[in-house]
């Protein structure tokens, strides 16, 4: 209750690696630029091939948040979050996460039960309240979360799901 904040402490080597990955700007260029960037994609592929999931998961999740914000985000949301998502300064960046999985469906997101109900407006768009429990999160300590939830009166399966941007700290 109250102001409980969950946090994860990473080993200093994680941050040293993150600084090297982000600060040259090449890997994040894969989602910083709107057009495909073959060099960034090749570097991501090579680092994945050698087992670097510790940062590749956050890079991929953040790319998803950027894509969703560009496609559907209000100008206010884009102004608030895109600069932090697109910076190459490791200590100033915002990371993205994905909360999709629920216990009853596993990887079958069409079976999701978490609900979203409209609750006014904020930042130039509809504000939603999310009710339910997610089972797994990719990049759990991220700043911004893409979360699926079932919208009121939506159809069964994946067509009844909405995708919501949730700041970790409100």
Where are these regions (language model features)?
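N-terminal glycine-rich flavin-associated loop
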Residues: 60-76
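Flexible loop/turn segments at secondary-structure boundaries
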Residues: 63-68, 104-108, 136-139, 154-156
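Extended, domain-scale alpha-helical bundle/helix-rich regions
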Residues: 30-65
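Internal maturation/activation junctions in enzymes
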Residues: 73-119, 123-126
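Extended, charge-enriched "interface" segments that sit outside catalytic cores
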Residues: 1-34
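A short core secondary-structure module
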Residues: 127-170
